[in-house]
Amino acid sequence: MTQYRGGYIASCYAQALFSVSDVNSICKDVEFVISVLENDNNVAMFLSSPRVSKESKISLIKVIGDYIDSILVKFMIIVIESNRGNILLQIFSAFLDLVRKYNKEVNISVTSCALLTKQEEEGICNALLERYGKVVGITNNLDPSILGGFIIRVNFDVIDVSLNSYLQSLRELSKMSVCSISE
């Protein structure tokens, strides 16, 4: 329950940042802050700790503020003043998801029995462009059990054109045909 609530709160803050900022100019700054929080555990723990005073946290943000957009600095101060420093990373990840959605950019996962070539990746990206938007990232997962073809996952959609799936469909059709003949 706490995680879901934190996710909901993070998405509300992300939506607020999205609505007040120039999305394209602030995106790099958000990525910078994410990298700082992910790569320096001390900074993340400092901003998350309930034992550290808000004033100390705000001082740190102002130091980082020399390198990032002023709107982002003010936003981070509001988050800290609201005792939400522990979800800053979630907020910024949700913000980047909103930016990708706004720019019609998607990350896809492709499961295949062999690594995709650059040409195959480009073909898949071009095929998905009209329906989903620009593909900005491809994760190629290997699974020899699919025998051939591939399975694409985009957001919550699954496009399964694997040989294993095709053979299962044929198996089901043949079972139905045998059942209808025996009747």
UniProtKB/Swiss-Prot annotation:
It is a peripheral membrane protein. Pfam families: OSCP. GO terms for cellular component: plasma membrane; proton-transporting ATP synthase complex. The keyword Ion transport applies. It is found in: Cell inner membrane. PROSITE patterns: ATPASE_DELTA. Keywords: ATP synthesis, Cell inner membrane, Cell membrane, CF(1), Hydrogen ion transport, Ion transport, Membrane, Transport. Its main location: membrane. F(1)F(0) ATP synthase produces ATP from ADP in the presence of a proton or sodium gradient. F-type ATPases consist of two structural domains, F(1) containing the extramembraneous catalytic core and F(0) containing the membrane proton channel, linked together by a central stalk and a peripheral stalk. During catalysis, ATP synthesis in the catalytic domain of F(1) is coupled via a rotary mechanism of the central stalk subunits to proton translocation. This protein is part of the stalk that links CF(0) to CF(1). It either transmits conformational changes from CF(0) to CF(1) or is implicated in proton conduction. F-type ATPases have 2 components, F(1) - the catalytic core - and F(0) - the membrane proton channel. F(1) has five subunits: alpha(3), beta(3), gamma(1), delta(1), epsilon(1). F(0) has three main subunits: a(1), b(2) and c(10-14). The alpha and beta chains form an alternating ring which encloses part of the gamma chain. F(1) is attached to F(0) by a central stalk formed by the gamma and epsilon chains, while a peripheral stalk is formed by the delta and b chains. This is ATP synthase subunit delta. It comes from Ehrlichia canis (strain Jake). The gene is atpH.
